[in-house]
Amino acid sequence: MDTSKEIIEENSDSVSVYGARVHNLKNIDVQIPHNKLTVITGMSGSGKSSLAFDTIFAEGQRRYIETFSSYARNMLGVLERPDVDKITGLCPVISIEQKTVNKNPRSTIGTVTEIYDFLRLLYARVGEAVSYKSGEKMVKYTEEKIVDLIIEKYFGKKTIVMSPLINNRKGHYKELFEQLRKKGYLNVRIDGNIQEIIPGLKLDRYKNHSIELVVDKLKVDEKDRQRLKDTVATAMKQGDGIIMLYCVEDDSINYYSKTLMDPVSGLSYREPAPHNFSFNSPQGACPKCKGLGFVNQIDLGKIIPDMSKSIYAGAILPLGSYKNNFIFNQIAAICENAGYSLKTPVKDLPDDVLDDILNGNDIKIKYDGGVSSNYFATYDGIIKYIEMQQNDDESTKAQKWAGQFYSQIVCPECKGARLNKEALHYYIDGKNIFDLATMEISDLMQWTNQVEKQLSNQQQAIAREILKEISSRLHFLNEVGLDYLSLNRNSASLSGGESQRIRLATQIGSQLVNVLYILDEPSIGLHQRDNDRLIKSLKELRDIGNTIIVVEHDKDMMLESDYIVDIGPKAGRKGGNVVFAGTPKQMLNSDTITADYINGKREIPIPPIRRKGNGHFLELKGCKGNNLKNVDVKFPLGLLLCITGVSGSGKSTLINDTLQPILSQKFYNSLKEPREYKELLGLEYVDKVVTVDQAPIGRSPRSNAATYTGVFSDIRNIFVELPESKIRGYKPGRFSFNVSGGRCEACKGNGYKSIEMNFLPDVLVPCEVCNGKRYNRETLEVRFKGKSIADVLDMTINQAVEFFESFPSILNKIKVLQDVGLGYIKLGQPSSTLSGGESQRVKLAAELSKRDTGNTLFILDEPTTGLHFEDIKILLGVLNELVERGNTVLVIEHNMDVIKSADYIFDMGPEGGKNGGQVVAQGTPEEIAASEKSITAAFLRKELGR
């Protein structure tokens, strides 16, 4: 009898998994203690995620769906059970993965964490309204109070009580006057003049008019209180809650209302409600940008990028160089009419001529129609044509073409605030809701802690609970190292690590208990300094009664955990076993690759020498994007460069949002606009830029390492040359799963079918026709060395290297995949199943297999994400090979093994957010370690043994 399984089954204090065979897991048994912090570690591709997400989480999700009604389950379809014998002790499971929260431009940190919802409630309940016309405080009264105020202010004075009906609108209003006359009213005030309502009265329908109904004329006296009361009630009814008082003696006007109103201008606001402060609601959103904060506008700089060129030579990009056609003839006529020609440089054309060319004109100009005729016509302009193409819903191609001439600019009406004028004129302690949304979380925490003192007793009673909720959520964001962010930061602009920590903070704030949380590398993007705060937050979540599983490679996280499960020993088919399970103390004495790195038996060595580079530089000047403070950076070329700094210090803004877009525009005509900068020098020393990120290598199960590296075309060509293929007349397309012919049509060559789960993520199930092989029966009958095309795609890279050893064109491409440590993945493994680290290494392998000039700049943003110590060692070998070829590798990184291995470092800081945005230190790792300004220096000294 197998006693290990019996022990696992009997132990009710743990999540007990046994017989797990998902992906590469080899029938493993694992016990994860309840109410403890457990780290699952191992090499990239060893099976960590297969255990944590594809087994434990998948089974938790399946059991949750089984609790639904049969109707709901039918709507969702059947969730397949993970390949596991049994899981006991499983509590409700919440998965927090390293994916960007939301690509929707309306999603912000404030909306995701619900802090903005509480702010909306706060402003709706205690915000003080101010008129955007006069700056006066808005007021509202009861009818009784209005009567008291009129008697007090106008006692003994002749007044006219009126009801505002029309405010500055066009129309003849004949029907309105007729209705008022029938109700017995005698006078109206039209555009400031009182006149009698005579039969047939009507106004100029094409002019704007303001109309008020005269309800009563009286000399205000206390004894007439009842009359005044009736008058006010009638005027309120006719004026939709607003009355207007005109004092004859001093020619003054005042407004009174039961709703919020400006007593000077008569401007009224709706009764405040939370949706009035939402940029996702028509009641709160800016009418110009519809709550987005930006608008798309035609950019003259994109239409005419080079003003020194002539129109004939192609200065107007949408038109290109001169062609003998109608539009060029029109533009030629406009130029000649003003005494210029198409060959005049654009910078020498007068503004009015250029304006006519771009925007058109209404003047009929004589055009030369050839030998026999002349004709006259108006010209619409280049901009109108581009706008027509942009608005063409029928043609995506036309829209894409027009889109290249547009730029996104801050909305001119709301200045990026997303809200309408009314919503932005409610204040608490002198700040509107947008002011709070733009504050860094650390500053907003201070404001919420002190603002209660600035409120009246009544406001304090209303706001106390709301402020408490806001403060607690801000506290949790601060605890996970996100104090440098602001609530209006777009969710799509967050890194995977930031998104995950936001979700973590939200979960800590929810105070759920008896839940199993599974997190995927929460330390991504976190500086070593902030790691302790993250670990403390996870322990807080554990201490209130939850079980935490973290898939992680961070040494500090492992040592601070309660329990470690090490999956390995290697990756792919050589992994999938539990090589260690126990406490961190026990692990230090164990014999695994992970343990060897933690206890110091293995290490990533410090390079014996630092390279000097090729003597050339790429100099970026005057960077001011986001929090960058007019930064100048001089990148030495031919080196492994590293950008370091605490979270939010400006690393990504400098590299991903400034340098990379500039180079992409230069080399590839990219449409992405760089952040503000002055100039970039040294471009002549770089001939290509390659951004190697961790995004998937494709968007569908059809993309894989073989298609991405281009080796699949060579493999298909081998199959086409086989005698059986020639007899059957098969062409390369027969062996493609992207086109009809040879592929399985039931799954369209995917090998899987996607089952729509409505409000849950879609589930992929193997195709029942081809059993996941992707091809039809006839195609699979063609074999090379006894293997079908599907068998070849099912080979690991290591197997393929042996199989194709006599085919240099194929071997060269797949050998590189083996060299970057991906020998365990399958040639045809769908890109959707590759981790971020694996995708990145496939991209690096593709670049390594190409011939390069040695002047390429490679940009990598946190390439160590998802990588084990051993994987990082392999990655550094690949990066160093690229540098040895003469290229420059620029890495944004927090991992100390990579930082200590760099030739040259730029450390950003000193802090995050507004306190960052400067280069505080630069030089070799040894020079950075000696810096007193750098926060990274202390951690680097430890790594360098100083």
Language model features by range: what are they?
Residues 1-946:
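Conserved phosphate-binding elements of NTP-dependent enzyme cores
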